[in-house]
């Protein structure tokens, strides 16, 4: 907050202008309705998944505990950007103060970083379940799961605490127009009138590290899973193992692919329009897709949903 105040004193201005999605749309009202519906579906889908996991005893396992954490992150993730964007469209306002921008940036970085590490933790959980089934209850007991989940949230917040203060401390005098629908680090950094090349290099290295550690864990886990599945004699066992892992791999590819584009590709690959479309995909659409991916192909989740609906219908 002190850095943001110093920045405001230096520039004499405290508001950014979010250019957003709606300026380029021929039908902004229709786009607003679509995004609002998607937002509600994301919240309701993830909330239902959390409720099912909490209420159904058959889903009280480490795998579903981590899925519930992912749903919680997705609900917070989409809530950081979409409500502000829709409210601005309704009110006809596109300004965001520096403190609000910094807070949005911090929450976004924290949640994105936490999800990176959570997806790696989920891959490790699948490795233990498939490769060491007899030791699974001991290796992944409730205390270990809580520790791993807490570690994911903590490591994600490190990214937010590192990048947000530095980004918001730069003097902004070229322009105050953020060509994005929220305060994303690259979109804000480009507005600075000071030399940010060193910071961009450090940010790149930080993002590589944030991606490299989880990707290494995920790759190693699935390599060992493939070796174990290959040695299985039971075709049914192979099918179940692949079904369990395919949902997680789908989410990993969607989320990490978008992150690699945003933070690791050279600036020559980027345009404001491309960046916004990619951001729409992983900040708005991914939270909608995750509960569908984890539930539609999961017999236990669908069984719990049918049971809950049957009980409510009978009552």
Swiss-Prot record:
GO terms for molecular function: G protein-coupled receptor activity; olfactory receptor activity. One of its GO terms (biological process) is detection of chemical stimulus involved in sensory perception of smell. InterPro entries: GPCR_Rhodpsn, GPCR_Rhodpsn_7TM, Olfact_rcpt. It is a multi-pass membrane protein. Pfam families: 7tm_4 (PF13853). Residues 54-61, 125-143, 224-240, 297-315 are cytoplasmic. This is Olfactory receptor 2T29. It comes from the Eukaryota. The keyword Transmembrane applies. Keywords: Cell membrane, Disulfide bond, G-protein coupled receptor, Glycoprotein, Membrane, Olfaction, Receptor, Sensory transduction, Transducer, Transmembrane, Transmembrane helix. The chain crosses the membrane at residues 30-53, 62-83, 105-124, 144-162, 200-223, 241-263, 277-296. GO terms for cellular component: plasma membrane. Belongs to the G-protein coupled receptor 1 family. SUPFAM superfamilies: Family A G protein-coupled receptor-like. Odorant receptor. It is found in: Cell membrane. Glycans are attached at residues 3, 9. Disulfide bonds join 101-193. Residues 1-29, 84-104, 163-199, 264-276 are extracellular.
């Amino acid at each position: 907050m002190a850095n943001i105040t110093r920045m405001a004193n230096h520039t004499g201005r405290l508001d950014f202008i979010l250019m957003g999605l709606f300026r380029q749309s021929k039908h902004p009202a229709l786009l607003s309705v679509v995004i609002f519906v998607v937002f509600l579906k994301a919240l309701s889908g993830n909330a239902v998944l959390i409720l099912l996991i909490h209420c159904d005893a058959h889903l009280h396992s480490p795998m579903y505990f981590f899925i519930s954490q992912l749903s919680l992150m997705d609900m917070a993730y989409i809530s950081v950007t979409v409500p502000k964007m829709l409210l601005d469209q309704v009110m006809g306002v596109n300004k965001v103060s520096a403190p609000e921008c910094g807070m949005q940036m911090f929450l976004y970085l924290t949640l994105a970083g936490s999800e990176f590490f959570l997806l790696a933790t989920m891959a490790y959980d699948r490795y233990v379940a498939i490769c060491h089934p007899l030791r699974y209850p001991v290796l992944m007991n409730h205390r270990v799961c809580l520790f791993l989940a807490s570690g994911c949230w903590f490591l994600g917040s490190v990214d937010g605490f590192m990048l947000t203060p530095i980004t918001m401390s730069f003097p902004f005098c070229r322009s105050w127009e953020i060509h994005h629908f929220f305060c994303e680090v690259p979109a804000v950094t480009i507005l600075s009138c000071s030399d940010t090349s060193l910071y961009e290099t450090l940010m790149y290295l930080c993002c590589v590290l944030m991606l490299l550690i989880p990707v290494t864990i995920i790759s190693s886990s699935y390599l060992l899973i493939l070796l174990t599945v290959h040695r299985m004699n039971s075709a049914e066992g192979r099918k179940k193992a692949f079904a369990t892992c395919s949902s997680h791999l789908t989410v990993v590819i969607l989320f990490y692919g978008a992150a690699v584009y945003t933070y690791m590709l050279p600036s020559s690959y980027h345009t404001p329009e491309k960046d916004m479309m990619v951001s729409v995909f992983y900040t708005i659409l991914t939270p909608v897709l995750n509960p569908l991916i984890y539930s539609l192909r999961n017999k236990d989740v669908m069984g719990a949903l049918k049971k809950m609906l049957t009980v409510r219908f009978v009552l």
